[in-house]
Amino acid sequence: MAANSEKQHLSIVICGHVDSGKSTTTGRLIFELGGLPERELDKLKAEAERLGKGSFAFAFFMDRQKEERERGVTISCTTKEFFTEKWHYTIIDAPGHRDFIKNMITGASQADVALIMVPADGNFTTAIAKGNHKAGEIQGQTRQHSRLINLLGVKQICIGVNKMDCDTAGYKQTRYDEIGNEMKSMLVKVGWKKDFVEKNTPVMPISGWMGDNLLKKSENMTWWKGFDVEVGSEKIHVDTIYDVLDKMCRVPERPVSAPMRMPISGIYKIKGVGDVLAGRVEQGVVKPGEEVVFLPTHTVSNPCTGKVFTVEMHHSRVDFANPGDNVGLNIKGLDKNNMPRSGDVMVYKKDSTLGQTREFTAQIQILDIPNEIKVGYSQLASCAAAVLPAACQS
């Protein structure tokens, strides 16, 4: 539990195909929970209208970059916070466009929960397309993200059948049933266990733009009777996305007493502050005043060390951060000629339990390989927040 909150912390990633309504749903959910003031929403609506994207007002709350707003797509992972009755959430809005899959992996690797979005409009077929490299057919990002979420070890998922208000869906049960059945079948095909999909994965009909079934049960879908989910030995009934987040989701066991480990997902130079490193604490506790090193960038001959000056969560300073907390650290004393890199693991300088190795055993899954794999084949390898080039040697 973070020092500035009485509620335990969970991270949720919102993922799925481009234009499935991820940012809009996220912005609307935070607005409904009181995290987006009316005055700011009015400004976002005006900006969206100016760019000819009137329906993007809620999305603009998450998409802050100029290019994101002009293109109408999420490029980088954006984080915001909100609170349910039980939990303190960090919400990670991941990019859906295939050009930014590396950013999506970085965001999803920090999540405890995933909301996988699929549009109920005409883009549904594209969103879950198998793809075929030889035929030049592109794999749908909802399909690819569903596979990646499984590989990255996210154990709690929910399917959001979004845009139920569109003309194609018309809030009809037949469209929801069609998409729900297709999604369940697809999840099994990309690696999820059938029993888990049937019993532990709610499929929720929603409209992020209109707010249907986000906090309150929709009056536009009177046929919707909710979903019964098995959580351990319990059976939980959920009617809305809020129910899923508050009632269904659980905080995983956190290794608080283990040696501190924090993969670095972002490095920033903030005017008036200095070097700020972002990441998610995986184990142990991060506290100000501690000397740290960044592996594998740090070596005896070329040190990469610093001292934690402050710890912040969502722009608020805290006394410490526990496992599962997404934080920004102001680090003093970094060598400008050997700065930490994204993917480095931060450990305490006094901790000698983590070293470098020349080999390790890993479970590997290959995604989207157009041809056969031969000696010399090069690819990108993703591990936690690190994305590095690799080559097949034998």
Predicted segments, located by residue:
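Conserved catalytic-core segments of large NTP-driven translation/proteostasis enzymes
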Residues: 177-370
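Long insertion/accessory domains within large nucleic-acid-processing enzymes
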Residues: 95, 381-394
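Alpha-helical scaffold elements adjacent to nucleotide-binding pockets in ATP/GTP-utilizing enzyme cores
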Residues: 25-29, 40-43, 103, 144-148, ...
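Residue-level "contact hotspot" at macromolecular interaction interfaces
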Residues: 17, 68, 107-110, 285, ...
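Conserved nucleotide-binding/hydrolysis micro-motifs of P-loop NTPases
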Residues: 97-98, 120-124, 154, 163-168, ...
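P-loop NTPase switch module centered on the Walker A-proximal segment
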Residues: 2-102, 111-124, 128-133
